[in-house]
């Protein structure tokens, strides 16, 4: 079984891969500007990214799709939808328009009193 270090965390808090051993850097993992120590040159085979945040693209990468909007079903009419903000996916718009047109033709064709 692996032992947990006394610091209680397995997350790297220093940029060891960027500095030569023996350099003194701050304990901050936020990519502070004042590093002392020799910078190791970037390997040409590796992708370049923001300093200190190479892992961020795995969790907070740029979205490939537009941001989805919140669509909620109206409690009083179980068939109607309310769009709160943003873009609407094309399929949802077409489906909503078709349902609306079918509902309008039914209400128009019914005899009025």
UniProtKB/Swiss-Prot annotation:
GO terms for biological process: cell differentiation. Signal peptide: none annotated. It holds the Pfam family PPDFL. The keyword 4Fe-4S does not apply. Keywords: Developmental protein, Differentiation. Belongs to the PPDPF family. Probable regulator of exocrine pancreas development. This is Pancreatic progenitor cell differentiation and proliferation factor B. It comes from Xenopus laevis (African clawed frog).
